[in-house]
């Protein structure tokens, strides 16, 4: 018997209404992501990539279709249940790191654990281990303003992975970095995938970086067109 996919989205659509006018952002998007798989969705700005990630992460609800993650239909869960899934089983990385400026790197990484009810001492220890995993074991006491752009994004990655999620959703995670740091971040994601078995779904406009992942799909005008070329 085949193992159930980690993520299955079926005929996913999203539209917005202004008066009598409907604007479709996503149209009948369907695909599956296996456990431990790294997949890229490639497309230009405005193609619907970020909207898709919001639906997959339970941050928004689709107009039509369904998102099934670890056997649960996310868009049928209550807001509280979706929030619990996001905290415990999903990680998020964005183009801008969204670190809390008044907290150290260590405190930023520990935050999801504390929100989930972990004891402070255990949260700090786990966060320290995660910072070491991304090569920042000596930078934990620094605040975001004292870190380079690449270091801030590594802290954001550590925060996304600190709860050992099954899946990390990454929205243009290297879009704000120079080429050297972008290469380094994609290399790090690959290492974490191999070491921890975490699945990654990365949206990006950079096909060359996307080709480092296991699979690439192209999105255009809100529709998936198949393998990116």
From Swiss-Prot:
Superkingdom of origin organism: Bacteria
Ligand binding (ATP): 43-50
Broadest EC class assigned to this enzyme: translocase
PROSITE patterns documented for this protein: ABC_TRANSPORTER_1, ABC_TRANSPORTER_2, LOLD
GO cellular component: plasma membrane
MF annotations from Gene Ontology: ATP binding; ATP hydrolysis activity; transmembrane transporter activity
Keyword Transmembrane helix recorded: no
SUPFAM superfamilies xrefs: P-loop containing nucleoside triphosphate hydrolases
Keyword annotations of the record: ATP-binding, Cell inner membrane, Cell membrane, Membrane, Nucleotide-binding, Translocase, Transport
Domain ABC transporter: 7-228
Compartments, record wording: Cell inner membrane
Any single biological process term in GO: lipoprotein localization to outer membrane
EC annotation from Swiss-Prot or TrEMBL: 7.6.2.-
Protein topology in the membrane: Peripheral membrane protein
Quaternary structure annotation from Swiss-Prot or TrEMBL: The complex is composed of two ATP-binding proteins (LolD) and two transmembrane proteins (LolC and LolE).
Family statement: Belongs to the ABC transporter superfamily. Lipoprotein translocase (TC 3.A.1.125) family.
Summary of the function given for this chain in its UniProt record: Part of the ABC transporter complex LolCDE involved in the translocation of mature outer membrane-directed lipoproteins, from the inner membrane to the periplasmic chaperone, LolA. Responsible for the formation of the LolA-lipoprotein complex in an ATP-dependent manner.
Name of protein: Lipoprotein-releasing system ATP-binding protein LolD
UniProt gene name: lolD
């Amino acid at each position: 018997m085949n193992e159930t996919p980690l993520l299955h989205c079926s005929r996913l659509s999203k539209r917005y209404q202004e008066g009598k006018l409907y604007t479709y952002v996503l149209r009948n998007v369907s695909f599956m992501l296996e456990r431990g798989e790294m997949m890229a969705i490639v497309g230009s700005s405005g193609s619907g990539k970020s909207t898709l990630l919001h639906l997959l992460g339970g941050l928004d609800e689709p107009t039509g279709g369904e998102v099934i993650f670890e056997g649960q239909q996310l868009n049928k869960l209550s807001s509280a249940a979706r929030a619990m899934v996001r905290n415990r089983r999903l990680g998020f990385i964005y183009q801008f790191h969204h670190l809390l400026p008044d907290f150290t790197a260590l405190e930023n990484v520990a935050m999801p654990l504390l929100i989930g009810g972990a004891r402070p001492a255990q949260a700090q220890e786990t966060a320290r281990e995660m910072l070491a995993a991304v090569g920042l074991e000596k930078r934990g006491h620094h605040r975001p303003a004292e870190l380079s752009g690449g270091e801030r994004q590594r802290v954001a990655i550590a925060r996304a992975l600190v709860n050992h999620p099954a899946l990390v959703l990454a929205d243009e995670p290297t879009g704000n970095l120079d080429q050297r740091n972008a290469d380094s971040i994609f290399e790090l994601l690959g290492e974490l995938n191999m070491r921890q078995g975490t699945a990654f779904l990365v949206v990006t406009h950079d096909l060359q970086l996307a080709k480092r992942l296991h699979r690439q799909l192209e999105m255009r005008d809100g529709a998936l067109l198949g393998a990116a070329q």
